[in-house]
Amino acid sequence: MPEQSNDYRVAVFGAGGVGKSSLVLRFVKGTFRESYIPTVEDTYRQVISCDKSICTLQITDTTGSHQFPAMQRLSISKGHAFILVYSITSRQSLEELKPIYEQICEIKGDVESIPIMLVGNKCDESPNREVQSSEAEALARTWKCAFMETSAKLNHNVKELFQELLNLEKRRTVSLQIDGKKSKQQKRKEKLKGKCVVM
């Protein structure tokens, strides 16, 4: 039997049209829509298992518009982890992530302890690429976050994206325990090298 149940809040940010909703819908529902429908804000839940506990991923798909700064701040303050999405076909969409990243730093403080993924979506449109993966990798190193390219359309690296985000959380949670006594749960996790599994 699972020991506990808790919510883990993930906020997805990015400019309009980069595929935030497509990534979330592909992960949660396994679907992809060709048409672009602007999002104000949607929340989805996905249950995952992590060792012997059940965790509910609460994924907030935020607006790509700059008209709702209060909603953006609220999503950051409530979030446990962040996915910053740009389109590899739009350099501007990568540039637009910088103020969002800065706001996460401002609200959350030490971002080294927070799982953040920089995601280059639409890698199926490689002939129209404006952002090289090496450039995004360099930015991710500067921001001290992880990097991955995805395609919601082809279902490429979508599940892996959320899996990696959870792995970052586990690694960072474990690393925070080194200066004090580790709990039995932490010892068990390290002994088993257990991982959160996306169902």
Curated annotation (Swiss-Prot):
Keyword Chloroplast included in the entry's annotation: no
Q: Which GO terms describe its biological process?
A: signal transduction
Question: Gene Ontology terms, cellular component aspect?
Answer: plasma membrane
Identify residues that carry Cysteine methyl ester. Answer: 196
Residues recorded as binding GTP, renumbered to this chain, are 14-21, 33-39, 61-65, 121-124, 152-153
Membrane topology category? Lipid-anchor
Propeptide position ranges: 197-199
Task: Tell me any Pfam family this protein matches.
Answer: Ras
Alphabetic keyword roster: Cell membrane, GTP-binding, Hydrolase, Lipoprotein, Membrane, Methylation, Nucleotide-binding, Phosphoprotein, Prenylation, Ubl conjugation
**PTM-bearing positions, type Phosphoserine:** 35, 126
Task: Kindly list the residues that the UniProt entry marks as S-geranylgeranyl cysteine lipid attachment points.
Answer: 196
EC code(s) of this entry: 3.6.5.-
The short sequence motif called Effector region sits at: 36-44
UniProt main location, coarse: membrane
Described by its record, this protein's role is as follows: Displays low GTPase activity and exists predominantly in the GTP-bound form.
Query: What is the name of the protein in this document?
Result: GTP-binding protein Di-Ras2
**What organism is this sequence from?**
Mus musculus (Mouse)
